Amino acid sequence: MRTFFSLLILVFTLTDISAQRKYVKPEFVKNWSKPGKHPDHIVLNFSEDPATSISVTWRTSKDVKSGYGEIAKAHANPAFISRAETIEAITETINYSNVVSEYDRDNPKSNKFITLNHNYHSVTFKGLEPNTVYGYRVGDGEIWSEWIQFKTAHKENAPFSFLYVGDAQNYILELWSRLIREGYRKAPDASFIIHAGDLINDAHDEHQWHEWFMACLLYTSPSPRDLST
């Protein structure tokens, strides 16, 4: 009996020590969140009629002066990419002022601010067939993203599922990403995802935005964010 109580005390003591352990936040490599020539922050967006059209946006460095989207009906045979249609994208340079360049979550007053110029590209694929799987990729004609699949909506009313999440805000990539994975595990055929509430803590923090994109764009369903605050 004495041995049992000794072991019990040891277990509770170790549990308490483990619970008190200081959390070590992850370090990000320099320029981790900055765009380059390879497309990132790729988002599939609803268009006027999701049964016959869909829009895509993505980000690059300002060195990439133009962009293109390619699309084709997707099949198990990878030869489908040989039938892809190429659409020229609209490219815009966006100037961001007061962007956090050196990020310290625990001491925000120490953050340093800079101005950034990034290029954003957008393309709308039209004339698609309802309830059909397509593959698409985006790039500048030489440097491309991977091929990403989506399915157009039914033309008539039909049941569908979607994910609704809110207030990502804190520990976005390191912890909130679990929610996205679990959501798609429970609803693997979700047609889209709605983000409500506070997506990040600081609208001018490039690191937080990149965390958000990295966390939720593990999946490429249409991702409306109109309900965010």
Range-by-range predicted roles:
Residues 4-12:
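Sec-dependent N-terminal signal peptides
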Residues 13-17:
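C-terminal segment of classical bacterial N-terminal signal peptides
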Residues 19-164, 185-186:
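Acidic, histidine-bearing metal-coordination/catalytic regions of metal-dependent phosphoesterases
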Residues 58, 190-202:
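Active-site beta-strand/loop signature of hydrolases that rely on acidic residues for catalysis
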Residues 166-169, 197-199:
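Active-site metal-binding loops of divalent metal-dependent hydrolases
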Residues 171-174, 201-205:
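Active-site environment of divalent metal-dependent phosphoester hydrolases
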Residues 203-214:
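Metal-dependent catalytic neighborhoods of phosphoester/phosphodiester hydrolases
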Residues 219-226:
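Conserved small/polar residues in nucleotide/adenosyl-binding loops
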